[in-house]
């Protein structure tokens, strides 16, 4: 038979119960504290992780900002370099595009040899080492209307001319050395004995010459238009006067004829009447002695 356990006292039970309850409560409290600590630790870890994430995000943002700032700084640097380049290029471009000073010289020829062409004049000057020559202009000779026409020779003659040299110094030396000297060259040349008549024009430009030539041309054309209009008016007046004179002459002729007729009518006019022929009747014969002529009467008188 197994021994039956004795029942414990209620106090002991209650005491045991109290101890157990206290232990349980203590254990409960301890468990609760540990759970709280765990929760707190979890919260801290979460907060730390959040803070770390936030810090990581902030670091990323800062890095991005730094990268953007670096990019902006790089762009600013490149723009500054480009601006410097552009500013450095601008004065160069301006210097390149700056208009060059007029360094050309112009010589005026007051007279030219007959039938001398522009190309021949340029060749004569360049053979004497006066060059380079940039432009040559010769004004043709204007012959008056009263001058006789040249039928045999059709070559042009020039009255004066201008020659532009690339250097003013060359133009001055050319004018000083060749003025009032013979053209020279070959002895049998066409222009050997002709004399140079030239002068260096100080401060004269080719544009001034072109303006002068255009002005003279316009004046000449205007003068020609005025002369043509005047000639047309004179022709018109002459034709009108000629036609009017013809009309007056016709009227005068008619008046003269009328006057002659009046004079002829004023003379005495003998009136002449035309007599009609008288016809004989049936009873009367043509042998009526009363109507015989003198000849018949004389013949009859001789017979009888």
From Swiss-Prot:
Region (Disordered): 1-98
Main location class: nucleus
Biased composition (Acidic residues): 55-69
InterPro entries, per the entry: ABT1/Esf2, ABT1/ESF2_RRM, Nucleotide-bd_a/b_plait_sf, RBD_domain_sf
GO BP, sorted A to Z: endonucleolytic cleavage in 5'-ETS of tricistronic rRNA transcript (SSU-rRNA, 5.8S rRNA, LSU-rRNA); endonucleolytic cleavage in ITS1 to separate SSU-rRNA from 5.8S rRNA and LSU-rRNA from tricistronic rRNA transcript (SSU-rRNA, 5.8S rRNA, LSU-rRNA); endonucleolytic cleavage to generate mature 5'-end of SSU-rRNA from (SSU-rRNA, 5.8S rRNA, LSU-rRNA); small-subunit processome assembly
GO CC, alphabetical: nucleolus
Feature: compositional bias, Basic residues: 41-51
Annotated disulfide bonds: none
Compartment(s) of residence: Nucleus, Nucleolus
Gene Ontology MF: a single term: RNA binding
Keywords linked to the UniProt accession: Nucleus, Ribosome biogenesis, RNA-binding, rRNA processing
Residues in RRM domain copies: 105-195
Coiled coil: none
Residue ranges with Basic and acidic residues bias: 70-96
PANTHER family in UniProt: ACTIVATOR OF BASAL TRANSCRIPTION 1
Known role: Involved in the small subunit (SSU) processome assembly and function, and in the 18S rRNA synthesis. Required for the early cleavages at sites A0, A1 and A2.
Protein family (similarity comment): Belongs to the ESF2/ABP1 family.
Listed name of the protein: Pre-rRNA-processing protein esf2
Organism: Aspergillus niger (strain ATCC MYA-4892 / CBS 513.88 / FGSC A1513)
Underlying gene: esf2
């Amino acid at each position: 038979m197994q021994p039956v356990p004795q029942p414990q006292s209620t106090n002991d039970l209650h005491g045991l119960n109290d101890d157990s309850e206290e232990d349980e409560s203590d254990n409960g409290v301890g468990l609760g504290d540990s759970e709280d600590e765990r929760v707190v630790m979890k919260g801290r870890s979460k907060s730390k992780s959040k803070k770390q994430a936030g810090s990581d995000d902030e670091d990323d943002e800062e890095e991005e900002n730094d990268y953007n700032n670096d990019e902006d700084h790089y762009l600013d640097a490149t723009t500054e370099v480009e601006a410097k380049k552009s500013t450095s290029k601008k004065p160069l471009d301006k210097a390149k595009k700056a208009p060059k000073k007029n360094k050309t010289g112009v010589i005026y020829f007051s007279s030219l040899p007959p039938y001398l062409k522009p190309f021949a004049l340029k060749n004569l000057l360049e053979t004497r080492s006066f060059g380079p020559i940039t432009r040559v202009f010769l004004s043709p000779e204007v012959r008056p209307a009263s001058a006789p026409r040249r039928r045999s020779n059709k070559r042009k003659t020039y009255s004066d001319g201008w020659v532009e040299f690339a250097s003013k110094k060359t133009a001055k030396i050319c004018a000083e050395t060749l003025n009032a000297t013979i053209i020279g060259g070959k002895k049998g040349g066409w222009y050997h004995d002709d004399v140079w008549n030239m002068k260096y024009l100080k401060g004269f430009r080719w544009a001034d010459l072109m303006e002068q030539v255009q002005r003279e041309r316009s004046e000449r054309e205007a003068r020609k238009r005025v002369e043509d209009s005047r000639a047309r008016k004179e022709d018109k007046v002459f034709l009108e006067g000629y036609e009017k004179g013809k009309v007056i002459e016709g009227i005068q002729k008619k008046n003269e004829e009328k006057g002659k007729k009046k004079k002829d009518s004023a003379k005495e006019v003998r009136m002449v009447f035309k007599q009609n022929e008288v016809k004989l009747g049936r009873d009367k014969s043509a042998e009526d002695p009363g109507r015989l002529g003198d000849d018949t009467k004389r013949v009859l008188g001789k017979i009888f």
